[in-house]
């Protein structure tokens, strides 16, 4: 019988882990019964999906607790699983602050030789 994810979300993490252990035991029993031919076509498939659903909801709950625990923490101090998912080049790119920084010599040249804007009117 299908277990709804909404029902699992109302349980605590420990209860979800207990439910997952029950589902694993049921799945093992179903696999044993499969050899004798007493199992319906979709029983094992349903049990596997129920187990996946339970483990997914458990992970969601764990991540929610982590997010609450690390709220207000800078990105560099966050665990990797809570950091934004980026590709490698974006992770290694300079930050906006680092891009804006100028050397003393660059600042001096910018002040001595400001950009000249030529206006053209007909």
From Swiss-Prot:
GO molecular function terms noted in the UniProt entry: mRNA binding; structural constituent of ribosome
Ranges in a coiled coil: 10-69
Name under which the protein is recorded: Large ribosomal subunit protein uL29A
Presence of keyword Coiled coil: yes
Signal peptide positions on this chain: none
Lineage, highest ranks first: Eukaryota, Fungi, Fungi incertae sedis, Microsporidia, Unikaryonidae
GO cellular component: cytosolic large ribosomal subunit
Assembly, per entry: Component of the large ribosomal subunit.
Gene3D superfamilies per record: 1.10.287.310, 6.10.250.3450
Source organism superkingdom: Eukaryota
Subcellular location: Cytoplasm
Entry keywords, A to Z: Coiled coil, Cytoplasm, Ribonucleoprotein, Ribosomal protein
């Amino acid at each position: 019988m299908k277990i709804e994810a909404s029902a699992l979300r109302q349980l605590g993490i420990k209860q979800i882990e207990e439910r997952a252990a029950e589902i694993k035991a049921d799945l093992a029993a179903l696999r044993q019964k499969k050899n004798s031919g007493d199992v319906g076509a979709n029983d094992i498939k349903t049990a596997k999906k129920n187990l996946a659903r339970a483990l997914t909801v458990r992970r969601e709950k764990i991540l929610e607790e982590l997010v609450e625990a690390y709220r207000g923490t800078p990105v560099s101090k966050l665990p990797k699983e809570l950091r934004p998912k980026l590709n490698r080049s974006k992770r290694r790119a300079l930050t906006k602050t680092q891009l804006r920084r100028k050397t003393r010599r660059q600042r001096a040249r910018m002040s001595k030789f400001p950009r000249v804007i030529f206006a053209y009117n007909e």
